Amino acid sequence: MRGRELLVAGIALMTACGALTACSSDEPSPPPPRPSGIAQIKPCDFFTQDELDEYELHDPAPLTPPAVGCMWQGSKFFEDASTVLVLTLQDRAADKELADLGSASGARISERPAVDGRRVWRDTTPGKDVKCGLIFEIDGSSSAELELSEFLGVSDVEPTQQDLCKGLDELAPRVEGKLPAVRT
């Protein structure tokens, strides 16, 4: 019996040590609280420095007023091609934005699967340049648009619309988590 008691005590000690080690390990910190509205978002500070590094984004530039947003250059979403990522915060409902886009010639808008309960639409409207956009519903009076496009004249390779949309699909959950909570 003595051997069995030692074995049980040893297992208990190892389990406790493992639990203590797990408790003291570097767990990721919880995400910062969501802003209550788009007015609280500073567009060029939307991504953390770690995210900018991960997404290979640089040179943030505010959009020209009256537009509220920021533009970054990058190359992660299509190897060897320079791209531009634009975040635009809009004081208008997604429905109104979609209606305006829908009236544009050749508009191709499709609803995507919801991201953490938030409605999202993809804009693949053809134009002179290759681009893909996502429109995020915030509430009945505001929305956000994220657009990824080729940075014209910078590289010899050209991404396809499919390449750019794939990059946005990768970013969508991260962007959703930084927007105000969905309100109905």
Give residue ranges: language-model regions:
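Bacterial N-terminal signal peptides that target proteins for export
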Residues: 1-11
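Polybasic, low-complexity association/targeting segments
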Residues: 3, 23-25
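C-terminal motif of bacterial Sec signal peptides marking the signal peptidase cleavage site
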Residues: 18-22
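A small/polar (G/S/T-enriched), proline-flanked helix-loop surface module common
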Residues: 26-184
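Core hydrophobic alpha-helical transmembrane segments of single-pass membrane proteins
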Residues: 13-17
